[in-house]
Amino acid sequence: MALSRRDFVKLCSGTVAGFGVSQMFHPAIHEAFAQTLTGERPPVFWVQGQGCTGCSVTLLNSTHPSIADVLLKIISLEFHPTVMAAEGEGAYEHMMRVAEKFKGKFIFAVEGAVPVAHDGKCCVVAEADHHEVTMTEVTKVLAANAAAVLAVGTCAAYGGIPAGKGNETGAMGVSAFLKKEGIPAPVINIPGCPPHPDWIVGTIGLGLQALATNTLGLLVKQGLDANGRPKAFYKNVHMNCPHLSAFEAGHMVKTMSDKDGCRFSMGCKGPRSACDSFER
C-alpha cells in the first residue's frame, strides 16, 4: 500500500529522531523526504571502486525507513551495479544521459577507493564503444557535475584497506583524488567499515534538505567536522562513554575482564574516535 504524504512525514519524524539529528534539522529533513513523494525524486548514481560491497550491504539493511522506501519513494537510484537490473554498456550510457540531463542536481555516491596507478586500469567500471571506462574517469566526470558527492565507507572516504602501505594500485579516497585532479566538488564523507545504514540514509536526508533550501555550501562548511563527516552522526565517542567519569577520576582497568573503570589504559581509542554507536 502506498504511503500518504502525512504518513511518510510521520515515518520520517521517527526515523530522523532515531538518527540523532539535532532538532534544528528535523523539520527541514522531514519536508525534504516528504517532498519526494509528490515531487521529482533526485537522481542518485552509486559507483563502486576498490571495495568489498559491504557498504551496499549495510544500506540494504536500512529499516527506518526501509530500503524499499528509500529506493522507491525517496531517491531515484539510476545506477548501482549490485542492485540494478540493467547491465553493460546500456546501463552506463543511461547513467551518463541522466547525469547530463540533471547536471548540478544529482547526488554521486562512491563506494570503495579510487585507484590511480596504471592509468586507472586496476578498476574498470564499464565499457563503452569498445573502450574500458575506469573508476578514475567516471569519478572525474560525475563529481564535476554533481550537486554533492557522498564518499560512502572508509575506503571511499580515506582510502581504507586498499590504500594501505604496499598497495600496487595507488588507491586513494575520493576527496584526495578530487583535490589531486583540481575538481572542487562538495564531498561528504561517511566513513565506517561498513557505516551504519542510518548514517547513509540520514546523510542523504541532510543532502536533500540542503539542496531543497540552497544551503549545501552551509552544510559543507558548518555541518561537517574537520574530516568531512556529518557532525550529526559522528560525535566523539569518549565524551559520550559510560566510563567517562572513571576516566576523569583516573580509575583505569587493569585487565579487559574488569567490570568497572575506563578502558583507555588498555588501548581504547574513544578520545580519537567519532561515531554515534552509543545511540544505536
Language-model segments: residues:
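N-terminal secretory signal peptides
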Residues: 1-3, 31-33
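Disulfide-bonded cysteines in secreted/extracellular proteins and peptides
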Residues: 12, 52-55, 155, 193, ...
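A conserved mid-domain beta-alpha-beta active-site/ligand-binding segment of alpha/beta enzyme cores
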Residues: 201, 205-280
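Short Gly/aromatic-enriched secondary-structure transition segments
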Residues: 59-65
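N-terminal export signals
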Residues: 7-30
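Metabolite-binding pocket within alpha/beta catalytic cores that recognizes anionic/polar moieties
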Residues: 36-41, 49, 56, 67-187, ...
